[in-house]
Amino acid sequence: MEMNQQHNEGNESFVALMNGFAGDGTATLPNDGEQRMSIPARELFAAIEADSGLLPVNSSNTNEKRKRRLQRLTGKQSEVLEGFFSICGHPDDGQKRHLSETTGLGLDQVKFWFQNKRTQVKTMCWKEENYKLSVENEILRDENRRVKIAHCTAVCLTCCNSSVQNQLAVEMERLMGQSEWLQQEIARSNGTPPAANLAFQLNSSADYVFSGQHDQQMIAELAKNAMHALIILAESHVALWFPVPGCSYEVLNKMAYDQAYPGDNSANAIGFKTEATRAVSMVMMDYKSVVDFLMDPYNYRTFFPEVISGAVTNRIYTWPTSDGYNGVIQLMTVEMMFPSPLVPARKCTFLRYCNVLNEGLVVVIDVSLDDGSIFSKCRKMPSGFLIQSIRPNSCKVTAIEHVLADDTGVHELYQPCMNGLVFGARRWVATMARQSARMRDVHHNKTAPQVSTKGRKNLMKLADDLLASFAGGIAATGGGTWTVVIGAGTEKDIRVAYRRTTEGSSSYNAILSVTASLRLPLPMRKTFDLLRNLTHRCKWDVLVHGSVVKEEVTIARGVGNDDTVTVLHCKRAGREDRGRTMILQNNGYDASGSFMVYSQIDSELMNTMVLSPSDLPPGRGGPSLYPTGFSLLPDVEAAQDSSGIALGEVGGTLMTMGFQIPVKLASGDRMYSRSAASAIRLMTDTIALVKKTLMNEHSGIYGVSPFHP
């Protein structure tokens, strides 16, 4: 073996062979035919050393030779090779020769390094793919199990079948007995006599509960009562829950619930409606990390960027310890939003309690503490998450969202979707599954070697901020920072709002948000696929302006192929001298709601974020982006007649379009009328272009335009 040149440190000639040694003292080297051959390690060392001039062939100082330690590549050599590998994984002979001269390594060392690196990347990708398939298998098994249970224990309240009624009665009796036993255990552990009515009653004593907020014992007892009620709701397979066909979530059987937990439901008397759903999903994250995201207000908001617009801890009754959040009780105020101007945001104050039931089994409980003198539009009944560890770095999460809410401000277009989709349990677990899968993909997936892990993290955080800004601008949340100028938010009455800002260029002092919600007679799946289609992008996207759009790189993948963070570039024909426009896009698909949000980003800023070794600053200290995008929701009312088909595959779509642009305010913080008029005209034209593109693509299915009767 002939080396290209000698090095300053002779032992570096062995670096290329380090990964090729077998446990039997032999080394494996690929020959020109990519076939493996085995050579005794000692003879191989002697041959290489003699050939490179480091030691004579017949040297008698074999003991000294044996004691020599192999040295790894220096940091600079590794940096050069890693950097070139991120650009080209298969260098030609000329590139290998140049790398050899740059790093001081031999040609064979460079060759073997790239071979080993390719094998390493391929192995890591295979392991990651195998892990994702195993998680998907667990999800399908759990779904199959729940479908079988629902099929075998189906309950019809309008049926006169005595066996079904007997089954419901037996289940109610079991639940009542379990609830009574749990209450007695709580009373025994607290050293207090059991109460006369052991059922959990939140609504019957709101004044009493709020007046005792500062009573530690009372707070702890209320939290434990809610915990046991949540466990019963999470583990019950019959009677209490009705599966929704094709929706992957369940709704509460209110009649059975009232029998299990009797008490006056005074909330309904003052106009509150009950929304109660349950959903299960696999999360690619260990259960302790999930608890950390749920218990910390900042992490809680960033983990659900399109769901939570604000979260704050009002008071901590039991502080966390070095062991974690076990036993922590805290009072939180959370503002939840849905990306549509026709659905008002919800602000709810509740008690959050974390308890470790067993090793690998944790429950996080939410229950409201409402003062009777303060009108609240959202009150939480026992809700929360049951988190069960399945295997290392993955767990099963059962979410229950049970609230009493005043939805008088919800538009009739979204009224059928309120109990289950808009603020339901399915949306919580879908977001958890998506975020955890993306976080894992950022660190473990090596399919985009041209972007470093640090750069992928930066772009991932920027994509989350982009989604949060888009949803917040549409819902006009954020403590009243948005001022609505005109419009209700429908197709015929486009809403325009603005907020002051100090970000971005000094020539602009405000951000203008334009949004509208409308119904499309196409399934959500077809609408989502059309919007993501890069070939048709130039037909409706004013940001592209007829350019050719191509995908540059995928930063992170979530649960499926429709859930990605990507960098796109668009190039206009005949304008090569102007370079390319970069677009950061964040999109996800789920039956509980889909989205596609994107923003133009400067290519120099993109390179800085990808190559910079530092993290993005927290909060709003990062680059200023102005999101444009779509929020999609399946029309539940139109899909009711197609039972058994997955939600979103049939029926219509409730689509919300929105974009934000920087503007300059007039004196007195007033909006220029021409700015609002131009924004409304731009939104109207975009809606027309999207409808036209949909009509042209699906005219063969509908025969005529689906947008006209």
From Swiss-Prot:
GO molecular function: DNA binding; DNA-binding transcription factor activity, RNA polymerase II-specific; lipid binding
Segments crossing the lipid bilayer: none
CDD domains found in the cross-reference section: homeodomain, START_ArGLABRA2_like
Gene3D superfamilies linked: 3.30.530.20, Homeodomain-like
UniProt-listed SUPFAM superfamilies: Bet v1-like, Homeodomain-like
GO CC aspect terms: nucleus
Taxonomy, superkingdom: Eukaryota
InterPro entries: GLABRA2/ANL2/PDF2/ATML1-like (IPR042160), HD (IPR001356), Homeobox_CS (IPR017970), Homeodomain-like_sf (IPR009057), START-like_dom_sf (IPR023393), START_lipid-bd_dom (IPR002913)
Subcellular location, record wording: Nucleus
Ranges in a coiled coil: 166-187
Ranges of the DNA-binding region feature: 66-125
Job description of the protein: Probable transcription factor.
Protein family (similarity comment): Belongs to the HD-ZIP homeobox family. Class IV subfamily.
Protein name per UniProt: Homeobox-leucine zipper protein TF1
